Amino acid sequence: MPLPSLSVVTPSFNSAEFLDDAIQSVRHQRAVAVEHIVMDGGSTDGTTVLLQRYPHLQWKSEPDQGQSDAINKGFRCAKGDLVGWLNADDYYLPGGLHAIARAAAEHPEADVIYGDCLFVDSEGRLVRSKVEHAFDAAILMYFGCYIPSTSTFFRRRLIESGVLLDCDYRVCMDFEYFARLAHAGCEFHYVPRFIAAFRWHENNISLSQAARRFQERRQVQLRFGARRHSDATFRWLADLHRAKRMARKVITGNIARELRVRRMLGQDTRWLETNAGWETCASLACW
């Protein structure tokens, strides 16, 4: 069965400290055709010097209107059948892109394909796992954005139809995008495999702007109807869907997967073929 090609878009701004891990993780993917596009926002920390070392990259460094704008610029340049974004401080796990491509080939009806991810610290050491479940629009709206964007790809046909990120969202752009796609009737397919690693550090936008994250999340819920109830009713529905989510993870065995991963807390998961991190990374990806 022929596999679809992939395009990875990496938005970057003064992220030279971590960007090489992201580049290497895409570069070393096997058995899948992938292009890597880096949209840099005019960094001054040596990012462009790093990018010049990799002739296979497509990249541009110029001012932008933020992360969503940079991702949209990259999406418009993408040639792959599937398009996703990988933030400059995150990285893919061995075989992750092949798993996405294979799932897309086996499920041509799927518009969005997503998998699981790991949370790591600034040094790439495992902090926790994020194991998910099959898509449920109600859980998305009442529990919150449980789909890890770093482990998600979209059919290019969505991009070509003009469905891009909303640049008004600076933190919850992924939540708004998923909610909009679900509201439009798009099909989501879950791959029960670790696809990527999300780096948890003090400068991470998703973690450092709690007030804005709460505001944008509430805005999405209002826009798509989850907040049409009283606050008390909304809290009850949120608790109900949190329990529903947990039940799904127990029934599918994904809680057991999370517990197995805990045995490797603190180990290096970066794509380093010259040390033990490679073995750790490869073994975790298959769990």
Where are these regions (language model features)?
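Conserved donor NDP-sugar-binding/catalytic core segment of glycosyltransferases
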Residues: 91, 95-127
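Cell-envelope/extracellular polymer assembly enzymes that use nucleotide-activated donors
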Residues: 4-7, 35, 176
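Short aromatic/hydrophobic "clamp" motif used to bind/position activated sugar donors
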Residues: 83
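A conserved acidic beta->alpha catalytic loop
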Residues: 25, 40-49, 63, 87
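Acidic helix N-cap motif at the loop->helix transition within catalytic regions
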Residues: 17-20, 45-53, 95
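Conserved nucleotide-sugar donor-binding catalytic segment
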Residues: 9, 129-220
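Short, acidic, metal-binding catalytic loop of nucleotide-sugar glycosyltransferases
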Residues: 24-33
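Glycine-rich, basic loop-to-helix element that forms the pyrophosphate-binding segment
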Residues: 62-78
